[in-house]
Amino acid sequence: MQFPAFYVTGTDTGIGKTVASTALLHAVRARGHTAVGMKPVASGCVATPQGWHNEDALALQAASQPQPDYATLNPYALPAALAPELAAADVGVSLSLVPLQLAFAQLRAQAEVVVVEGVGGWAAPLSAQLDQADLVRALQLPVVLVVGVRLGCINHARLTAAAIAADGLRCIGWIANEIDPQMERIEDNIRMLGQRLAMPCWGRIPWRPNAQAEALAQHIRLPQ
């Protein structure tokens, strides 16, 4: 595949990065490649006999083939459903790039493609010292932007794309994820997004809240 690893970010929190990331994993696997997900930092985790686990990270693990060890897929699992900087401080954890780089290297050794899902929107910091751009640079990844299609999405998408470029990073594609079934003129909005975003569209995920990731993969258009 043209891009053996990439970082999935979004126009905001709650716009469907995990939906898109799991669909991407299944789309890559449908092409005959092995693919694993990674959630470097996750907040809002729940206690399990195996430790703190996050719903989104578990979804990535389930969509992966082979399925990696949870601690490798999600090195920083934070209990509080807060911004990572606050959630980490609550439990006395100091986020560092080194464990994330080591975990990523392990995942790269396990599969042909690694889909790395970020936190919140692009400008959401990882810690007082680290932005997501720092992590993406350290892992040397291109970026895929998930646009939550709702009122205001054109503004959010253009601002996010501009911020990624300003950070000196490459956005290789965007995905339209329909999150508001009541949105008016949705076709026009998606058309306008396509006209204003310089990178190619990797797909349009329809509003299907109970759909399985494997079914949504048919709406992904991976580059050759």
From Swiss-Prot:
Specify the superkingdom.
Bacteria
Q: Which SUPFAM superfamilies match?
A: P-loop containing nucleoside triphosphate hydrolases (SSF52540)
| GO BP terms, alphabetized | biotin biosynthetic process
Assigned keywords, A-Z: ATP-binding, Biotin biosynthesis, Cytoplasm, Ligase, Magnesium, Metal-binding, Nucleotide-binding
The record's listing under InterPro entries reads: DTB_synth_BioD, P-loop_NTPase
Any one GO CC term of this protein is: cytosol
Per the record, the similarity remark reads: Belongs to the dethiobiotin synthetase family.
Quaternary state and interactors:
Homodimer.
User: What is this protein's name?
Assistant: ATP-dependent dethiobiotin synthetase BioD
Q: What species is given as this protein's source?
A: Xanthomonas campestris pv. campestris (strain ATCC 33913 / DSM 3586 / NCPPB 528 / LMG 568 / P 25)
Q: Which gene encodes it?
A: bioD
